[in-house]
A protein has these predicted regions:
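Intrinsic-disorder/low-complexity, polar/charged segments enriched in Ser/Thr/Lys/Arg/Asp/Glu/Gln
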Residues: 1-4, 60-62
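Compact, glycine-rich, soluble single-domain proteins
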Residues: 6-49, 53-56
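C-terminal structural segments of small proteins and small subunits
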Residues: 51-89
Length: 89
């Protein structure tokens, strides 16, 4: 199962946004990977992995999980929602 989303976070996935995203991904009931479109996937719960993506505002990323069912859907929905925000708290 996968979802594609455009990063709306003004700072992109760097430093604090990357840490918050990794924390949110790690709290999900299923493992999730993230990749820039056409790039290699990394563990979405890994701050360093996320930072190596170099995803900036406007970049398209793919979120993917091997899981199925409601947990997988909810996990991807939550992470898409996070990336769709312009600012993170």
């Amino acid at each position: 199962m996968e979802r594609t989303v455009v990063v709306a976070i003004t700072e992109g996935l760097h430093a604090r946004p990357a840490a918050l995203f990794a924390q949110k991904a790690g709290a999900q009931p299923v493992p999730v990977q993230i990749a820039k479109t056409g790039g290699d996937p990394v563990d979405a719960a890994s701050i360093l992995g996320i930072m190596t993506l170099g995803a900036s505002v406007g970049d398209e990323v793919v979120l993917r999980t091997e899981a199925d069912g409601d947990d997988a859907t909810a996990a991807l929905d939550a992470l898409v929602e996070f990336l769709s925000q312009e600012a993170v708290a």
